[in-house]
Structures are given as C-alpha cells and as structure tokens.
C-alpha cells in the first residue's frame, strides 16, 4: 500500500494521517522456534500460524500490528485443539482461514511519530469484552477504533446488539469510538455512548466527523468488574443465610407443635 500513488498523495496532503485496517496474515516458524498450539504444518517441512489482525499505516512507513486476541469459538478457535486435532474439520468457515487462529496475549496500541495519541485497534468480537478493552486504555489508547465484519449475522438483531456493545464500551472508558463495519453498521460514537453518525446496514458509504482523544482513566478502567466479583462472592453467602433462616423457622414450628 505504501507504493500506491493515491496513498502517497494522501500522506503528502495529510502528514498526520493514520490508516487502520484489517488484514489476514501468517507467521512462518523458523527451525528451533517454539510452536503454538494453533501452529499448522506446511505441506513440506515447517510450520506456520494464521492471524486475524489489524494494522496501521502512516507517514513513517512503519507498519504497526495487532493480532486478534479474543477469538470466536467454533470459527476462529476450537477448544482443546492440541488434544483433539480432528476437530479442525468441524470448524465453521465464514471466509478466509478457519479452525484455529493464533493470538497475542496483550493487545497492541497504535502510536506514530507525528502524534503521541494512541489508537486502540479492536477487532470484531473483542469489543464485547469490557475488561479486555480496558487494557487498551491502560496502555495509552485515547481513542477506540473497531473494525468488524458482521455479515455472518445476516439481517438479524445480532448486528444491532454488536453495535450496542460498542456504545457500552465507549461509556465505560469515556472514549470516543469509531466503528468500521465491513458488512454491518459503521458509526461514530462519542464518549457518552451517543451515536453521532452512522450508516445503514450493509450500506457502502463514508462517514466524516470529529472525534476527541481522552487520556483520563475511569473507575471501571482502573478496577474492572469489581461489582460483579463482589456480587459473585455475596450471592452464595446470601443463599446460605436464606437456607439457614428457613431451617430455623421450620425447626421452631416443629418445637411449637410439641
């Protein structure tokens, strides 16, 4: 893409331009490299991994990469594949490679030499995980950018729900969010979760708008789902207390009858 005349003209006109897009990529393992559980054998010798990834292109001609960390079960990820390799044949192929992508443990944040503000490259299904997305903000992301393909939902409530998750993530982190949906609803969302502009479903269009960076960390970003954890701890205690009280009342009634 750096060799594209159109891209070069854009860079010359807008030196701070940052293009974030999706890419399917592969990694070839060299002899002696430690293999991941998703590594595939080449027809001859050697192994490789496939990744669902995002990349950033800018004026520095340096490519920044983020490999999707939260994979869709049954499409991009199969459980216990290292023990049940035959399950690869059961994977649902929705375009591209299927049956076990590679991942990276910690999400990447895109920076560049022209601007210190970080962009969080969020790929599709990753946007439903609130605590996972907090890691982007903790690493300096001041703007969220989601790239997704919602076509496999077809015209069902699924792609609406996926968009709703994006609004929730914007509120949790108080980050403006841009969403590019290849076959869904693209949108610009502010830090209050309000949709500033959007396309229709499966509409080919371009959105133009202003977004603001925010470096502040919200309570949720700092501490995560603490309410859920507290509730999970208290719930069995409340259940036990209820059972004890019920048993005590039953015992009291029996004592009165005597």
What spans do the regions from the language model cover?
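Enzyme catalytic cores with a strong preference for nitrogen-chemistry domains
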Residues: 1-258
């Amino acid at each position: 893409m750096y060799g594209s005349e159109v891209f070069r003209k854009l860079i010359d006109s807008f030196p701070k331009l940052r293009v974030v897009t999706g890419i399917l990529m592969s990694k070839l393992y060299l002899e002696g490299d430690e293999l991941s559980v998703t590594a595939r054998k080449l027809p001859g010798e050697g192994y490789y991994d496939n990744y669902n990834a995002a990349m950033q292109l800018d004026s520095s001609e340096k490519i920044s990469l983020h490999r999707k960390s939260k994979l869709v079960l049954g499409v991009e990820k199969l459980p216990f594949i290292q023990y049940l390799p035959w399950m690869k044949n059961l994977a649902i192929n929705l375009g591209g490679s299927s049956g076990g992508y590679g991942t990276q443990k910690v999400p990447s944040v895109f920076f560049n030499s022209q601007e210190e503000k970080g962009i969080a490259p969020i790929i599709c299904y990753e946007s439903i995980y609130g605590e996972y997305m907090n890691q982007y903000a903790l690493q300096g992301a001041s703007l969220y950018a989601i790239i997704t393909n919602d076509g496999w939902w077809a015209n069902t409530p699924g792609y609406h729900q996926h968009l709703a998750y994006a609004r929730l993530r914007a509120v949790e982190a108080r980050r403006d969010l841009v969403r590019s949906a290849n076959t869904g609803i693209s949108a610009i969302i502010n830090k209050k979760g309000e949709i500033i502009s959007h396309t229709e479903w499966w509409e080919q269009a371009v959105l133009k708008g202003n977004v603001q960076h925010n470096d502040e960390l919200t309570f949720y970003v700092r501490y995560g789902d603490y309410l859920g954890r507290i509730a999970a701890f208290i719930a069995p205690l409340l259940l036990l207390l209820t059972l004890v009280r019920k048993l005590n009342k039953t015992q009291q009634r029996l004592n009165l009858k005597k």
